[in-house]
Amino acid sequence: DKLMPQEAWLGNGGNRIELLRNSGNGMYLVDQKGRTARVAGQSAEVENSFAKEGPGRVVLKRSGYYVTDDGEKLARAESWFYFAAGTPLIRITHSIIFTRDTNEVWFRDYGMEFKTPEAPRDVYCALGSQDNHRVKRVETNGREVYMVQEDYPHFLERTYKATVGISDKGKDAPVENAETADDWAHGNYGNHGITIAMPWLAERFPKEISFGPQGARAVLWSGRSGKELDFRAKTIAKDYMKSWAGIILKNPSDKDLDNVKSNAQGAARTHDIWFIPQAGGYREEVVKKMAQRASNPPLLLADT
C-alpha cells in the first residue's frame, strides 16, 4: 500500500549494502495550508501493473492518491519505475495529476524521499552547465544539505538564482550562490554513494536535490523557493510572467485577475528522476559521467 520502494540493497562482490529502509511512503506533497499528503496507506488506493516484463528490462507502473493523515485525497500520482538487467540504475517517470479544483487546493512543495538507514558523510553538488561545470563539497555533520534552483530566465525575466545550503533545526543557511544548478547531486556514505539526477533541473525551476539524516530527496517543486504551485491567474501573472504580464496584459489589477478562470483540474506535471547507487567512495569523473548520461539519454535504444 506504498508507492515508493520500501527497501533496497546494492550487491557488491557477494555482499549487500543497504540503500533504503522504510522508504515506501516517500512520495509526498505539502498543500497551501501546510498539510502533508503521501501516496501510502489503504486510502491511497495504490495499484500495480507491468508495462514491460523482461528479460532485459522491467517497467513497473504504480499509481495512487496523495492522502492526508485524515484521509483527504489532494492529487493523484502515476509513476513508472524502469529497471535494467546488470545495472543498479533506476529511472522513475513521475506524473502528478491535479484532481481537485486548483482555485481551492494548490501546493507549496512536492517530491520523492528516498529514506536511507544513515546520513551521508558529505554531499557533492554540481553547479553550472555541463560546459562550465564545478562541484561544491559540503560536510553534513548530521544536517541536511540542499541544492535548489529558485529562478531561471523565462519570458522577459533574466534572473538566475541557485543556492547550495545547509538546513539545521528548521533554519536554512546558504553556503554558496550560483547562477545555475546542474542536473545532479551526490551523497557520499563511505562504502557507497547515491546520485540523484534530474534532467532540466534549472530550466524547470523551482527544483531541489537534498541529502540528510532523512535520506535523499528529489524535490519537483521546492518550497524553499518561496513560490507555490498555484494556477490562479493572479499568481501566474505576478510570480511567473512578471514584467511580461505588465507589457502584454497592460498591468492588470488583482480584481481583473481574480475574474479570470484558471482551474487546472485534470492537468498533470511529469518529470524523470534517476536514482544512481554506486559501491565505494566518491569518484568525481565516474559520478559525473553517469549523471550526465542519465540527463542526456540516447535517442534510440534497442528493446529486449
Task: For every predicted segment, state its role.
Residues 2-303:
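Beta-strand/loop-rich accessory regions of lumenal/periplasmic or secreted enzymes
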